[in-house]
From Swiss-Prot:
Residues 666-783 are annotated as: Flexible hinge. It comes from Enterobacter sp. (strain 638). Keywords: ATP-binding, Cell cycle, Cell division, Chromosome partition, Coiled coil, Cytoplasm, DNA condensation, DNA-binding, Nucleotide-binding. Plays a central role in chromosome condensation, segregation and cell cycle progression. Functions as a homodimer, which is essential for chromosome partition. Involved in negative DNA supercoiling in vivo, and by this means organize and compact chromosomes. May achieve or facilitate chromosome segregation by condensation DNA from both sides of a centrally located replisome during cell division. GO terms for cellular component: cytoplasm; nucleoid. This is Chromosome partition protein MukB. Its main location: cytoplasm. The keyword Cell cycle applies. NCBIfam families: PRK04863.1. Belongs to the SMC family. MukB subfamily. Transmembrane segments: none annotated.
Length: 1482
């Protein structure tokens, strides 16, 4: 008996509380006992992790978290580990007594999400002496050890001979090894299998009836429906060949379409990119060469521009310097012109003011005389007015006094007093103290005489004063003229200086008359000097441009030489233009021809590609279109011959098929109707009786029975006589032989055996001679031999038919290809190669471009020389007329000499202009200056004194006259005399007063009118004096300003200054124009230099980038080319017609192909990954790898039994040809196939009955299991009602639904699903397809429903639900069911693993305290009976009597936490044996 494998131990390394702990596992039950937090769950978690290292499934939770949501739970593994490397290892001894160590390396991953890294591994061949802890750790000293990393563990184990260490990258590989070695009961192929296994472990660990396991008990307990699948296979056995043919057609169809699609799109995708890279490489090379040419050209241009810039900058500097001088000269000339104009305006003002002053002087002298006369007359009028006033006042006083005397008595006294006052006043004024009224007349006469004398003297002095005043005015005028001309001087020197000035004025006038001739001479010389300077400048510029110093004498010869050069260069330039035009025309013609060839090249390449394909297909070379048409006629003849031969082979093949079908009839009947007749007559076919005849005897018996070989042997002929009447459905000749089919022999005939023949005596008069057939068909052996030979011949004919069909279709396709070629390409296919002509044209174009470039350079040089020569001739044309000026070396000295003379003359002219009028005025009054009228002041004093004397005398005479007038007042007589005398006096006084008042009025009027006239004369005099003084001051200022201007203001000065200014302005304008041209040219040159510099930098950068790109791409391109050549796909990828497409068109073509390829390879992971990698534009070789991968993939998919080629492109053609043949074969055999639904229903019923019986057997093992109130456990398996109806219909009423099963559009599964829907219209099928539903209906497990029932107390049999059972009962019930599941898995998987392996059985149970002692004992019995291991976690109050118990106590020592473990053997049957105590170091 095969021993069951066992788990020996569990080892935990670096877990929380366990540094290096090995738990030896009992063969039955291992109990982990300890309080809360002792480490029981951690130990079982380590065991489960080593069994199922799937982080998506592992979830260690407490039982108190049952109601928590999954999102709030911690997976629980991270917290059970310590930092660093951790291990969980299982030590197993399998049924072969092999030691296997399996486990996982765990390590916490830093981060907030508390992840754990798991690596499974396995160790085989490890000696039993090596303990897991010693293997996984390294001892450092007595109290320290180090955990080895996985790499260190591998290196350590490699040192041990015979030990194999395996590390797994997938959990599937890990579980596959565990299944093969008998560690797990079931092969866990997928995540779904792992999930089932984990759910089983989880249900075992936490106890109870898991709803998930209860719902999926069918998946856990019922094996795969191999019986139904076998029935389905048997049911379709008759369809196999047809299915294979159909599958071949479908595969061929899909492969053909896939091949076409993949080949075309992959070729477009890769070839477009390949040719784009080839074009880009060629373009990049051309660009790199072009960049290099442009770089060298730009460098030359930059050097030329720099030289040009230096020359223009130098010339611009000279022009700027010259411009500064010209601007200064022009500004000076402009200022000089302004000064001349200002001086002329000043001179005009001076002349105008001088004339005005002369007029004013005359008017002033005249006005002075008028004012003097008016003043004298005014004084006289004033004297008369004053006398009149005095007389009127006196008369009024007298008359008032007289009137007063008349009015009062004191009048006389008043008059007398007044008389005395008048007398006293006269004494005072006349200085006559002895004056009396009587002597007043005498003194009056004396003083009147004195008054007359003073008046006469005053008049004399006035006359003298007038004469002196005139002489003094003339002297002062002459002195002022001398002072104005010469400046301040002594009055005594005025006459001498005036004489010198007059003599010098004559000389100055003579010099001033020479100004105009000198100026004209100077202008002429200055013009010649300027022309000389201009000629020297032009000569200097010419020499600078010419590059060497040229003598004046050589200028004419040089002029002739330059004219000759111009003529020659002109001819050269004109000839160069014609030559350039001819070259350009030829280049344009080449370009036009090239464009036409470029347009024709793709068409020609397509035609050549088609022609090459035709040549490859037929193996012929075609030189002309006539060869093509001749070969096409040969193809037609060959096609007709092949069709005839194919039809003959097809007819023979069909005959063989019919013969094989006839020979394959049951019992050897050649006619299928014989079997029905034999069954109807109750007989047996003769061929069936002799079915066991050997192959050697077959010819004899075949000849013996002859035509009656197909007879029916019946027990009694008389019984079937009636049945023969009306018999129609039978062969033409039906032989019936009477005899016992069980003991039939050949005694019915009289036979004589001859050499290879027999003579059968049928009757006395009828014999039959039959030779032994060459191919006997009597007996199964003979028929099988014949069928075998027929099959061999049929295979040969099939191959020949396929070959001929292929050849026919190939010929037809070749004919179609020739027809398409003739219709599309024959017109251009045999024309010359346009690409060769394009290459020749490109070579010629390059030569032309180089010739044009060289010609342009030469022409440019000639143009430059031509322009230089023209400029030189133009410069010489301006210089040659001035050669005499260039030779005149004394011109500048003569200009200086004339300039000095002109300066002197201009100075004289300015003197004459300034003082000419003054000298003219001085000349007639020169004699006045000889004597100085110094007595004029004394005369003025005498005149004033005489005026005062005359005024005093007049007052004295008036006073005396008043006394004389009042002399009567000194003696009055009586009042009568006084009244009469006063009356006369009053009248006289009144008359006199009237006369005096009239005189006074007249004198007043005269005084007023004369005063007004005098005032007017004074105002006119003041105005004239003011105007004279103002204009004299202005004239002085103007003369000073004119002197300050310092410019000679003659008549031609302004014209000369303007001409000079205009000349300088013209020169300055020309200079500025040249400077602007130079600045613009310099700016353009700098811009051109900047552009050239930027362009040069850009070209250098582009050239280096392009060169680097070319060099970089060269390596990649070499790799691509090497890969292309090594893979042999260059012919497919190098599509020359694509070279004429643009990069965008090729990229678009590649992108479109890529878009079509993505869905095409979506189902192929390898091609999808390679395609995704090929999308990297930086790795073009990956596209080649993708193309090679597509070719390799297609080669692998070529069915060699159908298509005999390795080339996918050829395979496409063969597929299309083979498709027709397979379709015909399918059509011919489709009618002979049939399907039986009754057999399928019977097999499903039998499978259901077998599984129900197996479940009943399992229930017998569960009937003795009891937990608490649960007395027994069982499983109920029932068939669903809807599915039972389906089985009944399939077996009994299938004829009613043949429309489904006979449909060519439905598979059997789909027909089954349609039938199920037809029978159960009330059931909602959801989104599932009929194929899916039909496949489910072929699985017998879907016909069954399964539930768990318990016999509990007085309730009897109940459905096992967690609500109806206690916790302990649920745990026990669940454990029982899980044991059944494990046992069922082992039975199911026994055929998959080795026969000598019995897998390990192990389950878990956490919180076993919920089970009573009886339940636990039952679990022990269950483990013992089933050979199962069980790990139980229980609190300290549970102490099983059997198995091994570990006491776990978690302790803290020096801030270090570890679990103290004590192991005990079971103590019920024997004294307890204590295991050595072990404490873990942490």
């Amino acid at each position: 008996m095969i021993e069951r494998g066992k788990f020996r131990s569990l080892t935990l390394i670096n877990w929380n509380g366990f540094f290096a702990r090995t738990f030896d596992l009992d063969e039955l039950v291992t109990t982990l006992s300890g309080g809360n937090g002792a480490g029981k769950s951690t130990t079982m978690a380590a065991f489960v992790t080593a069994l199922i290292p799937d982080l998506t499934l592992l979830h260690f939770r407490n039982t108190t978290e049952a109601g928590a949501t999954s999102g709030s739970r911690d997976k629980g593994l991270h917290g059970k580990l310590k930092a660093g490397v951790c291990y969980s290892v299982l030590d197993v001894i399998n049924s072969r007594h092999q030691r296997v160590v399996v486990g996982v390396r765990l390590q916490q991953v830093a981060g907030r999400d508390r992840k754990v890294d798991i690596k499974p591994f396995a160790i085989q061949g490890l000696p039993t002496s090596v303990q897991p802890t010693a293997m996984l750790t390294e001892t450092l000293n007595d109290r320290q050890a180090r955990v080895l990393s996985l790499q260190e563990l591998k290196e350590k184990l490699e040192e041990i001979e015979g030990v194999q260490f395996k590390q797994f990258n997938s959990i599937t590989d890990y579980h596959s090894l565990m299944f093969d070695l008998g560690i797990v009961a079931r092969r866990l192929r997928s995540a779904s299998d792992r999930s089932k296994y984990y759910r089983l472990i989880e249900a075992s660990l936490y106890g109870g009836i898991s709803s998930a396991i209860t719902r999926s008990l069918r998946d856990y307990l019922l094996p795969e429906n191999s019986g139904v699948r076998k029935a389905f296979q048997d049911m379709e056995a008759a369809l196999r060949e047809n299915r294979m043919t159909l599958e071949a057609i479908r595969v061929t169809q899909s492969d053909r379409d896939l091949f076409k699609h993949l080949i075309s799109e992959a070729t477009n995708y890769v070839a477009a990119d390949y040719m784009r890279h080839a074009n880009e490489r060629r373009i990049h090379l051309d660009k790199a060469l072009e960049y290099r040419r442009e770089l060298f050209t730009s460098r030359k241009q930059l050097v030329a521009e720099q030289y040009k810039h230096v020359e223009m900058a130098r010339e611009l500097g000279e022009q700027n310097g010259a411009e500064g001088d010209l601007e200064a000269d022009y500004q000076a000339a402009s200022d000089h012109l302004n000064l001349v104009q200002t001086a002329l305006r000043q001179q005009e003002k001076i002349e105008r003011y001088e004339s005005d002053l002369d007029e004013l002087q005359i008017r002033l002298e005249e006005q002075n005389e008028v004012v003097a006369e008016a003043t004298e007359m005014q004084e006289e009028n004033e004297a008369r007015a004053e006398a009149a006033e005095l007389e009127v006042d006196e008369l009024k006083n007298q008359l008032a006094d007289y009137q007063q005397a008349l009015d009062v008595q004191q009048t006389r006294a008043i008059q007398y007093t007044q008389a005395l006052q008048a007398l006293q006043r006269a004494k005072e004024l006349c200085h006559l103290p002895d004056l009396t009224p009587e002597s007043a007349d005498e003194w009056l006469e004396t003083f009147q005489a004195k008054q007359q004398e003073a008046t006469d003297k005053l008049l004399s002095l006035d006359q003298k004063m007038s004469v002196a005043q005139t002489a003094h005015s003339q002297f002062e005028q002459a002195y002022q003229l001398v002072t104005a001309i010469n400046g301040p001087l002594a009055r005594s020197d005025a006459w001498e200086v005036a004489r010198e000035l007059l003599r010098d004025g004559v000389n100055q006038r003579h010099l001033a008359e020479q100004v105009q001739p000198l100026r004209m001479r100077l202008n002429e010389l200055e013009q010649r000097l300027r022309e000389q300077q201009e000629a020297e400048r032009l000569l200097a510029e010419f020499c600078k441009r010419y590059g060497k110093r040229v003598d004046i004498d050589d200028l004419e010869a040089l002029h002739q030489e330059l004219e000759a050069r111009i003529a020659s260069l002109s001819d050269s330039v004109s000839n160069a233009g014609e030559q350039r035009m001819s070259l350009r025309q030829e280049l344009e013609q080449l370009q036009s021809r090239t464009q036409k060839l470029l347009q024709r090249a793709p068409v020609w390449l397509a035609a050549q590609s088609s022609l090459n394909q035709l040549s490859e297909q037929c193996g012929e070379e075609f030189e002309s279109s006539q060869d093509v048409t001749e070969y096409l006629q040969q193809l037609l003849e060959r096609e007709r011959e092949a069709i005839v031969e194919r039809d003959e082979v097809g007819a023979r093949k069909r005959a063989i098929d019919e013969e094989i079908e006839r020979l394959s009839q049951p019992g050897g009947a050649e006619d299928s109707r014989l079997n029905a007749l034999a069954e109807r007559f109750g007989g047996v076919l003769l061929s069936e009786i002799y079915d066991d005849v050997s192959l050697d005897d077959a010819p004899y018996f075949s000849a013996l029975y002859g035509p009656s070989r197909n007879a029916i042997v019946v027990p009694d002929l008389s019984l079937i006589a009636d049945q023969l009447e009306g018999l129609e459905d039978c062969p033409e000749d039906l032989y019936l032989i009477e005899g016992d089919p069980q003991s039939f022999d050949d005694s019915v005939f009289s036979v004589d055996e001859l050499e290879k023949a027999v003579v059968v005596k049928i009757a006395d008069r009828q014999w039959r001679y039959s030779r032994f057939p060459t191919l006997p068909l009597f007996g199964r052996a003979a028929r099988e031999n014949r069928i075998e030979s027929l099959h061999a011949e049929r295979e040969t004919l099939s191959e020949r038919f396929a070959t001929l069909s292929f050849d026919v279709q190939k010929t037809q396709r070749l004919h179609q290809s020739f027809s398409r070629f003739i219709g599309s390409h024959v017109a251009v296919a045999f024309e010359p190669d346009p690409e060769a002509e394009i290459r020749k044209l490109n070579t010629r174009r390059g030569e032309l471009e180089r010739a044009i470039s060289l010609h342009e350079n030469d022409n440019q040089q000639s143009r430059v020389q031509f322009e230089q020569a023209k400029e030189g001739v133009a410069a010489l044309n301006r210089i040659l007329p001035r050669l005499n000026l260039l030779a005149d070396e004394t011109l500048a000295d003569r200009v200086d000499e004339i300039q000095e003379r002109l300066d002197e003359a201009q100075e004289a002219a300015r003197f004459v202009q300034q003082h000419g009028n003054q000298l003219a005025k001085l000349e007639p009054v020169l004699s006045v200056l000889q004597s100085d009228p110094e007595q004029f002041e004394q005369l003025k004093e005498d005149y004033a004194y005489s005026q005062q004397v005359q005024r005093d005398a007049r007052q004295q005479a008036f006073a005396l006259a008043e006394v004389v007038q009042r002399r009567a007042h000194f003696g009055y007589s009586d009042s009568a005399e006084m009244l009469s005398g006063n009356s006369d006096l009053n009248e006289k006084l009144r008359h006199r007063l009237e006369q005096a008042e009239t005189e006074r009025s007249r004198t007043r009027d005269a005084l007023r009118s004369h005063a007004a006239q005098l005032s007017q004369y004074g105002q006119v005099l003041a105005s004239l004096k003011s105007s004279f003084d103002t204009k004299k001051e202005l004239l002085t200022d103007l003369q000073k300003e004119l002197q300050d201007i310092g410019v000679r203001a003659d008549s031609g000065a302004e014209e000369r200054a303007r001409i000079r200014r205009d000349e300088l302005h013209s020169q300055l304008s020309n200079n500025r124009s040249r400077r602007n041209q130079l600045e613009k040219a310099l700016t353009l040159c700098e811009a051109e230099m900047d552009n050239l510099t930027r362009r040069l930098r850009k070209l250098e950068r582009d050239y280096h980038e392009m060169r680097e790109q070319v060099v970089t791409a060269k390596a990649g391109w070499c790799a691509v080319m090497r890969l292309v050549k090594d893979s042999g796909v260059e012919r497919r990828l190098h599509r020359r017609e694509l070279a004429y497409l643009s990069g965008d068109e090729l990229r678009s073509m590649s992108d479109k192909a890529l878009g079509a390829l993505r869905p095409a390879v979506a189902d192929n992971e390898h091609l999808r990954d390679v395609l995704r990698m090929s999308e990297d534009p930086k790795r073009p070789e990956r596209k080649i790898q993708f193309f090679v991968a597509v070719y390799q993939h297609l080669r692998e998919r070529i069915r060699q039994d159908i298509i005999r080629t390795d080339d996918p492109v050829e395979a496409i053609e063969q597929m299309e040809i083979e498709l027709g043949r397979l379709t015909e074969e399918l059509t011919s055999r489709e009618q002979t196939l049939a399907i039986s639904s009754r057999s399928v229903a019977n097999i499903i019923r039998k499978t259901i009955q077998r599984e129900q019986n197996r479940i009943r057997m399992l229930n017998q093992g569960l009937q003795s299991v009891s937990f608490g109130q649960v007395n027994s456990v069982r499983l109920n398996v029932n068939v669903l009602e809807a599915h039972a109806t389906l089985l009944d219909v399939l077996s009994e009423q299938h004829e009613q639904h043949q429309d489904l099963f006979n449909s060519n559009r439905l598979t059997f599964s789909e027909a089954l699903a349609k039938l199920y829907q037809r029978l159960n219209p009330q059931i909602d099928m959801g989104q599932r397809t009929p194929q899916t539903i039909g496949e489910e209906l072929l699985d017998y497990r879907n016909y069954l429903e399964m539930e768990v029932e318990v016999n509990r107390g007085s309730d009897g049999w109940l459905r096992a639900e967690s609500g109806a059972l206690s916790t302990g009962e649920a745990i026990g019930t669940g454990m029982s069911i899980l044991v059944m599941v494990v046992q069922s898995w082992e039975d199911e998987s026994r055929r998959l693993r080795g026969k000598d392996i019995s897998p390990c059985r192990l389950l878990f149970l956490d919180e076993a305290a919920r089970l009573d002692a009886r339940s636990i004992a039952t679990l022990f019995e269950l483990c013992d009976r089933l050979g199962m291991q069980l790990i139980i976690a229980a609190p300290e109050n549970i102490s099983p009597e059997k198995g091994t118990t570990y006491k776990l106590v978690r302790k803290v020592f020096q801030n270090t936490e570890h679990v103290h473990v004590v192991g005990l053997r079971g103590f019920a049957p024997q004294p307890p044996e204590s295991l050595p105590e072990a404490a873990d170091a942490s």
